[in-house]
């Protein structure tokens, strides 16, 4: 994460995350800007409905974990801004960006990325497409990947990164503050059982392409 500094009471923080386009991962930078003025919370950068709804999940999760939600004008930009962002994967990095910008957290590690959906209680829920995002993390120079605990085994299949399984926001905040470290996940070793095949539910967007493939598979 980057902390460019304060100016006129404003603070900008960047948090590394990952997104999914089709079946390929790509890096996303979550930029959180706190400034003066009437309190507001805007998310820009081509977010879909699920991403825009992250505002309420983040607000509730911050309060339930005992942190202070910033009373500021909040602007969150998801870069690259010309790539549509889908799903709930950005909940966690948005929350961390806000808490870092408001100095509830120390600066985040620059080689770390974060992803995961938040419940209103601050628990982390699994997200789809973690493996291609984890593979992208290695290519992007990310060395630490924080994911929902139920996604950790899948993420460990990617080489070159250390995966941290996160159960809830309070646990992660204690880890980032240096209070209670989260043990890294051990690499998952398949045991030879039949593995589930890839599912279209893991592909974000591409509805027309998926429809064509379904018709072809049915013999239509």
Q: What name fits each language-model region?
A:
Residues 2-220:
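Peripheral, non-AAA+ core regions of ATP-driven protein-machinery
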């Amino acid at each position: 994460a980057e902390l460019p500094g304060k100016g006129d009471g404003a603070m900008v923080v960047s948090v590394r995350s990952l997104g999914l386009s089709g079946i390929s991962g790509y890096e996303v930078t979550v930029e959180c800007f706190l400034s003066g003025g009437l309190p507001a919370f805007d998310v820009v950068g081509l977010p879909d409905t699920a991403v825009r709804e992250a505002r309420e999940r983040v607000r509730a999760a911050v309060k339930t974990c005992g942190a202070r939600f910033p009373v500021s004008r909040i602007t969150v930009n998801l870069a690259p801004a010309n790539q549509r962002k889908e799903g709930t994967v950005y909940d966690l990095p948005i929350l961390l960006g806000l808490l870092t910008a408001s100095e509830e957290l120390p600066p985040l590690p620059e080689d770390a990325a974060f992803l995961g959906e938040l419940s209103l209680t601050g628990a982390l829920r699994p997200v789809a497409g973690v493996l291609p995002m984890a593979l992208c993390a290695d290519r992007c120079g990310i060395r630490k990947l924080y994911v929902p605990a139920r996604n950790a085994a899948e993420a460990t299949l990617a080489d070159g990164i250390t995966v941290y399984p996160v159960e809830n926001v309070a646990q992660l905040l204690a880890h980032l503050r240096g209070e209670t470290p989260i043990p890294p996940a051990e690499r998952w070793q398949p045991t030879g059982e039949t593995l589930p095949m890839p599912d279209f539910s893991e592909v974000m967007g591409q509805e027309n392409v998926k429809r064509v493939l379904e018709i072809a598979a049915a013999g239509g």
